[in-house]
Swiss-Prot record:
GO terms for molecular function: DNA binding; DNA-directed RNA polymerase activity. It comes from Polynucleobacter asymbioticus (strain DSM 18221 / CIP 109841 / QLW-P1DMWA-1). The keyword Transferase applies. InterPro entries: DNA-dir_RNA_pol_omega, Pol_omega/Rpo6/RPB6, RPB6/omega-like_sf. The gene is rpoZ. This is DNA-directed RNA polymerase subunit omega. Its EC number is 2.7.7.6.
Length: 67
């Protein structure tokens, strides 16, 4: 399995602080039971970073109000 790096994620979200916020928010969603958007058997934090690197999760999710 390929390793995920910060550089891979920074291509999608160039600001490191926004990257941390987006990945943390998405990891919490995954722990609460949301389905992952990429195929992975890793922990929620790694899955969240893989989603960011793949471009399916971005910083726009930080401005959305949860229902």
């Amino acid at each position: 399995m390929a390793r995920i790096t910060v550089e891979d994620c920074l291509k999608t979200i160039p600001n490191r602080f926004e990257l941390v916020l987006a990945a943390t928010y998405r990891a919490r969603q995954l722990v609460q039971g949301h389905s992952p958007r990429v195929e992975s058997r890793d922990k929620a934090t790694v899955v969240a970073l893989r989603e960011v690197a793949a471009g399916v999760t971005d910083r726009d999710m930080l401005t959305k109000v949860p229902l």
